[in-house]
Regions:
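Helix-adjacent hinge/juxtasegments
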Residues: 49, 53-93
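Alpha-helical transmembrane segments of multi-pass membrane proteins
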Residues: 12, 16, 38, 57-66, ...
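Transmembrane alpha-helix interface/packing and boundary motifs in multi-pass membrane proteins
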Residues: 13-30, 90-99
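Interfacial segments of multi-pass membrane proteins
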Residues: 30-46, 89-94, 108-117
Length: 157
């Protein structure tokens, strides 16, 4: 692969890693797709092995980013719909106030949904904090998977 091609792949991987943090665009498809293009264009056995490792890490990360937070929320008695409403509030907040709006919209939506469910401010706030922890786990798991895959690619380059 040419130097320009490698740089473009690296930029797409970087965008994927950033996507793991900002949660606005999908991280795993960007990182995995970029490494797939690199492996295809490079064509070596080691490139395909690196792609396979990266793909497995990204698939595992995608599964775990749903399973681990869901278990924590289930243990706390918070329905999955709360996280869905939080994500919707985050999207609305993003369009109102960009990154800060994303966080504020998510927190507000989770609190409102949980308050309407429990009719208790303390319970709603505790549920909001638990949902935020779950969201944090989602980001951390996706970021670890993206960085691990990016590192595997970096070793291969």
């Amino acid at each position: 692969m040419s130097i320009l091609g490698t740089v473009i792949v690296g930029i797409v991987i970087l965008l994927g890693v950033i996507g793991a943090v900002v949660q606005v665009w999908p991280s795993a498809p960007l990182v995995g797709g970029a490494i797939l293009v690199w492996a295809w264009m490079t064509g070596t056995t080691s490139a395909w092995i690196i792609f396979a490792v990266a793909a497995l890490v990204l698939i595992l990360g995608t599964v775990l980013k749903y399973v681990i937070p869901a278990r924590g929320m289930n243990k706390a008695g918070i329905p999955q719909s709360t996280l869905v409403w939080g994500a919707a509030g985050g999207v609305v907040g993003w369009f109102i106030g960009l990154p800060l709006g994303l966080v504020l919209g998510m927190v507000a939506a989770i609190f409102i949904v949980e308050y309407l469910r429990s009719r208790d401010t303390a319970t709603a706030w505790a549920s909001t904090l638990q949902a935020l922890k779950a969201f944090g786990w989602t980001i951390a798991i996706e970021l670890i998977a993206a960085l691990t895959s990016a590192t595997a690619w970096g070793i291969g380059v």
